[in-house]
């Protein structure tokens, strides 16, 4: 496969940003070992924003010949008080429910879960020279910068936090270099940590990424954050700045069950959540249901997406591109309820293999139901 085609696969939807395309091209041209990683905190149920968005991108990377890795961030989850801050429970969930759920998500999005390496953070954090890398990074970043970066944990600047949380950004950057990662992958909300990684890459003394004597900068790949289904706290949205802020604030959240569809939700749960979804008629700029259609259904174009309607409401209509769907919705030719029902039916069918898996292997899900789910 030529370099141009590899770049197309890596930058296609749901990629929202690549820092930078020029650096990616350089790494491919010099034949640097291409190692991807995406790290996850272990907390509640896996929703579509985690499972399908990451799964889709992993599938693309595999097609481009990139080695893929999922980093099960147990220590990071402990620092960020996930699952009650109980490290033993976090590790148990990571190696059962979360690992199996991500494998099934990757599979339904066209990837090969058997070609994904799963690494538990403890396996590398318990090695002494990992912390040497953390210190090396920390010596190249100001305290003020680290404090601004705590938003990667879903924390707000100015929020009262324990000191361990200030170590978190340096650990996340160290994860990249210690594992020799050339493609650091995450949602857009992790951007601050990745920018630090790019900036310190050529200053590091320990575990810098090198190829033929050249210190390399990693590429940062950020996928789209699916919007949560709930109505935003401010409506209508009047400014572009307000819209950008809301996009991150209103992402899908496992702590707000009706904002998210989980990968193992029943057909009735999926229908119910979509029926209640915020989907104003003719609104195409901020519309969670359209957002899901764009990044899940129309990830590959052209495709065929049929919306079934009674003849008196125009009959069935089939769209092959997202722009066609968006145009009809903007012009009022497509009713919100018809869109919601069609997206729900698509998701029910897409997620059937995941539901089937957890019906045959109920133990991981039963474990999750026994644990108090925290944000």
UniProtKB/Swiss-Prot annotation:
Main location group: cytoplasm
Keywords in alphabetical order: Aminoacyl-tRNA synthetase, ATP-binding, Cytoplasm, Ligase, Nucleotide-binding, Protein biosynthesis
Record keyword ATP-binding present: yes
Motif ('KMSKS' region): 251-255
Keyword Ligase tagged: yes
EC number: 6.1.1.1
Residues holding L-tyrosine: 37, 168, 172, 175, 190
Compartments, as annotated in UniProt: Cytoplasm
Function statement: Catalyzes the attachment of tyrosine to tRNA(Tyr) in a two-step reaction: tyrosine is first activated by ATP to form Tyr-AMP and then transferred to the acceptor end of tRNA(Tyr).
Family assignment from sequence similarity: Belongs to the class-I aminoacyl-tRNA synthetase family. TyrS type 4 subfamily.
Subunit structure: Homodimer.
HAMAP family: Tyr_tRNA_synth_type4 (MF_02009)
NCBIfam families given in the database record: PRK08560.1 (NF006330), tyrS (TIGR00234)
Protein name: Tyrosine--tRNA ligase
Species name: Thermococcus onnurineus (strain NA1)
């Amino acid at each position: 496969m030529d370099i141009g085609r590899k770049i197309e696969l890596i930058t296609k939807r749901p990629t929202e940003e690549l820092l930078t395309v020029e650096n990616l091209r350089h790494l491919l041209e010099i034949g640097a070992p291409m190692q991807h990683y995406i790290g996850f905190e272990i907390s509640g149920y896996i929703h579509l924003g985690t499972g399908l968005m990451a799964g889709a991108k992993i599938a693309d990377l595999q097609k481009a010949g990139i080695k893929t890795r999922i980093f099960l961030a147990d220590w990071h989850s402990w620092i960020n008080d996930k699952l009650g801050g109980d490290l033993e429970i976090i590790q148990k969930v990571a190696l059962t429910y979360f690992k199996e759920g991500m494998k099934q998500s990757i599979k339904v999005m066209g990837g090969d879960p058997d070609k994904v390496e799963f690494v538990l953070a403890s396996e590398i954090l318990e090695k002494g020279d990992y912390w040497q890398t953390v210190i090396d990074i920390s010596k190249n970043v100001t305290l003020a910068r680290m404090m601004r970066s705590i938003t990667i944990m879903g924390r707000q600047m100015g929020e009262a936090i324990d000191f361990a949380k200030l170590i978190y950004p340096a650990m996340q950057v160290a994860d990249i270099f210690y594992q020799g990662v050339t493609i650091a992958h995450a949602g857009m909300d992790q951007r601050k940590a990745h920018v630090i990684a790019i900036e310190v890459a050529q200053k590091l003394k320990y575990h810098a990424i090198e190829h033929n004597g050249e210190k390399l900068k990693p590429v940062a790949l950020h996928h789209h954050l699916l919007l949560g289904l709930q109505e935003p706290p401010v409506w209508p949205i009047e400014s572009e700045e307000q819209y950008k802020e809301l996009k991150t604030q209103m992402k899908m959240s496992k702590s707000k069950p009706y904002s998210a569809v989980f990968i193992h939700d029943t057909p009735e749960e999926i229908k119910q959540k979509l029926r209640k979804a915020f989907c104003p008629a003719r609104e195409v700029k901020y519309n969670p249901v359209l957002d899901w259609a764009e990044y899940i259904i129309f990830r590959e174009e052209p495709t065929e997406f049929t919306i079934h309607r009674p003849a008196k409401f125009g009959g069935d209509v089939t769209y092959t591109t997202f722009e066609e769907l968006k145009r009809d919705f903007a012009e009022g030719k497509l009713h919100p309820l018809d869109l919601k029902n069609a997206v729900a039916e698509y998701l029910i069918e897409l997620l059937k293999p995941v539901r089937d898996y957890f019906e045959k292997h109920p133990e991981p899900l039963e474990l999750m139901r026994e644990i108090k789910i925290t944000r």
